[in-house]
Amino acid sequence: MKIRNSLKSAKLRDKNCRIVRRKGRVYVINKTNPRFKARQG
């Protein structure tokens, strides 16, 4: 999982990327290709 300042570029890396909010943190998850996971930090 990458920790990034801006998730906009992380979201655009793959068409299956979704932005989710969990416990006050913003995540990018990708069910089909989990290597695109990221968290905003």
UniProtKB/Swiss-Prot annotation:
A biological-process GO annotation: translation
Keywords assigned by UniProt?
Answer: Ribonucleoprotein, Ribosomal protein
GO molecular-function annotation terms? structural constituent of ribosome
**Top-level taxonomic group:** Bacteria
Write down the SUPFAM superfamilies for this protein, in alphabetical order: Ribosomal protein L36 (SSF57840)
Where does the secretion signal sit in this chain? none
Give GO cellular component annotations, separated by semicolons: ribonucleoprotein complex; ribosome
Kindly give the Pfam families that the UniProt entry links to this protein: Ribosomal_L36
Disulfide linkage: none
UniProt record similarity statement: Belongs to the bacterial ribosomal protein bL36 family.
Read off the PANTHER family from this record.
50S RIBOSOMAL PROTEIN L36 2, LARGE RIBOSOMAL SUBUNIT PROTEIN BL36B
Q: From the Swiss-Prot or TrEMBL record, give the protein name.
A: Large ribosomal subunit protein bL36
Q: Which organism is it from?
A: Paramagnetospirillum magneticum (strain ATCC 700264 / AMB-1) (Magnetospirillum magneticum)
The gene behind this protein is rpmJ
